[in-house]
Amino acid sequence: MAGMKSARRSAEIHKAVAVLREAGVDAEIQFTASPGDGRRLATEATTSGCDLIIACGGDGTINEVINGIVPGNTPLAILPGGTANIAAKELGLPGNIVRAARQISACRPYRIPLGRATWEDSGITKQRYFLAVAGIGFDAHIISQLDVGMKLRMGVLAYIWEAVRQVFRYRYQAFQFTADSRATSSTFAVVQRSSRYAGWLRLARPHRVHDLGFSCCLFQGEGPGRYLLYAFGIVTQTHDRLHGVRLLSGSEIRCASDQPETSVYFELDGELAGRIPVTFEVVPDALTILAPESFSRTQQ
């Protein structure tokens, strides 16, 4: 579970644990205190033979836990407790922690694919899985500048505030975006394995977490004026009609630059990961996830 942020959240978590125990789940509670704890705790639970891992937190916490499980086979259940909660929404889970806990005993296991990012960091090859979204460029830069305390206090409003600040400061560096050998350029790209971005927005063509491949939205313009227009288009869901916006799909995505001074960040499930060049691919049959019966109907 992500560290308790308030008295209200503490009460919700303890009530959810009580619900699980009433349902016969012998739950051992572990709290995260710093980045990386979710991955470490999930790895320890997997290697110790735990039957089920229940992750309570936002998409970043879920991402850490997934990377602690895979390539193991321990099933994962989710209690939504973050800002965007894309993973929970994609699975059809209630938005309330306690209600989601009540549903766990009725959920079924499903095997789903995951996205995987591969990149170099100081000469070391790194890999990380992601469930829903990767962002390259502008949104990753926002995350790199975001004040953690403000995020905890304000939630999604902190992202909006930082986006407004950065739209006038960002350098809008172009990079090469290649989808299955089709190359183009972009200043901001979203690579989705989900139907949602930032919790409720829909940028790319419809995609579901159990589908193979990626659905991508590219923004190719530069400067504050163009990006403010993009923001208006995204909110009104007319962005795909704007000049410099492209919708693509592919099974392997590569983002790179031929300019050595280019420094473009990318994020995975809302958490800063690294800098380009980076390659995204899909790993089929990668994770066992618990979801309601309604999730099976979206697979048809």
Model-identified regions with their sequence ranges:
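ATP/NTP phosphate-donor binding region
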Residues: 1-53, 63, 98-102, 296, ...
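Gly/Ser/Thr-rich active-site loops/lids in small-molecule metabolic enzymes
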Residues: 150-158, 202-226
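Glycine-rich phosphate/pyrophosphate-binding beta-alpha loops
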Residues: 135, 139, 190-204, 272
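Short Gly/Thr/Asp-enriched flexible loops that form oxyanion-binding sites at enzyme active sites
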Residues: 61-74
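Catalytic core of DAGKc-family lipid kinases
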Residues: 21-23, 32, 71-75, 79-188
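A generic structural signal for short beta-strands and their flanking turns/coil linkers
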Residues: 171-173, 185-187, 210-214, 249-251
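ATP/nucleoside-binding phosphotransfer catalytic cores, i.e., glycine-rich phosphate-binding loops
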Residues: 183, 208, 218-300
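N-terminal glycine-rich "phosphate-gripper" loop used for MgATP/nucleotide binding
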Residues: 55-59
